[in-house]
Amino acid sequence: SLSMYKVVREPVTPDYLDEEELQRIIEFDSPIERLVITRDMFLFGCFTGLSYIDIKTLTNEHFETDKEGRRWIKKRRVKTNVLSRIPVLPMAQSILDKYSGGKTLLPLQDCTDTNRNIKNIVTLCGIDKKVTFHTSRHTFATTVTLANDVPLEIVSQMMK
């Protein structure tokens, strides 16, 4: 029986991209359209903190504008049902604008394909880290929120 074995897991420090690495991804370009789309979807994750499934299920109904004219994403996380209120930063807005008019809000590819494309992009950008779509969430929680003065209570609420 396996019950006599104890699984010892090393605590995993989730990788995130620092500002310089994030800048490399922002500046990445390719003649291969699917890589450009993947870059944009990954950056949307970096600038909203939304997970893959939360981006996939994002609709226009999740957006609201406050009295000051700032746009917010108000959405429950699929995984935890926790309600998040996320500021729509300029980078996220420009990605939404770029893909507006499509069949879906954002052209997110299959998760496996997306992660394979991310691996290629990261390699082409000379970044030596194991990066998946989930890395974008941690990049938001660290690098992006610091650079954009996103209040800590918003970040901690979103990371639940």
Model segments located where?
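Conserved helix-loop functional segments at active or binding sites
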Residues: 24-31, 61, 94, 123-127
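C-terminal catalytic core of tyrosine-transesterase DNA break-rejoin enzymes
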Residues: 43, 47, 53-54, 137-160
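C-terminal catalytic core of Y-nucleophile DNA break-rejoin enzymes
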Residues: 11-12, 77-120, 126
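Basic, Lys/Arg- and aromatic-enriched nucleic-acid-binding interface segment
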Residues: 2-52, 70, 110, 148
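A short linear hydrophobic-aromatic micro-motif
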Residues: 72-75, 129-131
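Short, polar N-cap/turn motifs at the start of nucleic acid-interacting alpha helices
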Residues: 62-69, 128-129, 149-160
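Short basic/aromatic active-site micro-motif
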Residues: 37-41, 111-112, 128-148
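Residue-level detection of the helix-turn-helix DNA-binding "recognition helix"
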Residues: 60, 119, 123, 146, ...
